[in-house]
């Protein structure tokens, strides 16, 4: 049997997993704050998409820039949907993997820039301020997580270095460390 992952669990499960993917853009706290983190990032991303479509129609001279932002937002959205579809057959928290953080993070960067530049006047300072407050609040937990990940990587690298120095053959290195 060549199947690696479980079959998709359906549209609603795929959308849930896609929102989980987007929630990871907040780092590890996005996992802790699920499902609110997914709703937060999903709504902001949808709002940015709507603002971009409005800018496309109302600012023809800005269409190249708007198209670029739409491409980035669309790419992250496509990653979220593809991950949602591909992982929805796994457990209920399959989309909340830390490895998705760097793939999902550009969505919030685009949200920040798009709302600050093209958004309605009332939101131009409110949304960036809210995002600043959220990221300031999450900075320390994310920093602690990164420090711990660095320590773990250093320990694994030290074991690997000892095995190489001891003359362990490549096939055993692969079997032990991969």
Regions found by a protein language model. Give the residues of each.
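Hydrophobic alpha-helical transmembrane segments
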Residues: 1, 54-58, 113-117
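Extracytoplasmic catalytic-loop and juxtamembrane helix elements of membrane-embedded
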Residues: 1-23, 87-97, 149-160
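Intrinsically disordered, polar/acidic, low-complexity terminal segments
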Residues: 5-6, 29-44, 48-66, 122-178
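Alpha-helical transmembrane segments of polytopic membrane proteins
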Residues: 8-17, 21, 32-46, 98-105
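Hydrophobic/aromatic-rich transmembrane helices and adjacent perimembrane loops
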Residues: 22, 93-117
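Transmembrane alpha-helix segments characteristic
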Residues: 60-87
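Hydrophobic membrane-spanning alpha-helices of multi-pass integral membrane proteins
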Residues: 71-78, 103-113, 127-137
């Amino acid at each position: 049997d060549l199947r690696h992952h479980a079959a998709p669990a359906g549209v609603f499960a795929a959308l849930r997993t896609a929102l989980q993917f987007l929630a990871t853009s907040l780092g590890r706290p996005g996992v802790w704050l699920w499902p609110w983190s997914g709703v937060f990032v999903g709504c902001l991303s949808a709002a940015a998409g709507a603002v971009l479509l409005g800018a496309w129609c109302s600012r023809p001279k800005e269409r190249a820039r708007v198209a670029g932002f739409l491409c980035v937002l669309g790419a992250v959205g496509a990653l979220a949907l593809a991950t949602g579809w591909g992982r929805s057959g796994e457990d209920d928290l399959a989309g909340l993997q830390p490895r998705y953080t760097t793939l999902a993070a550009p969505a919030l960067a685009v949200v920040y820039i798009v709302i600050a530049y093209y958004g309605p006047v009332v939101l131009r300072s409110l949304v960036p301020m809210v995002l600043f407050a959220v990221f300031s609040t999450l900075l320390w937990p994310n920093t602690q997580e990164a420090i711990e990940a660095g320590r773990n990587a250093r320990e694994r690298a030290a074991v690997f270095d000892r095995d190489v120095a001891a003359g362990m053959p490549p096939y055993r290195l692969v079997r032990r460390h991969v």
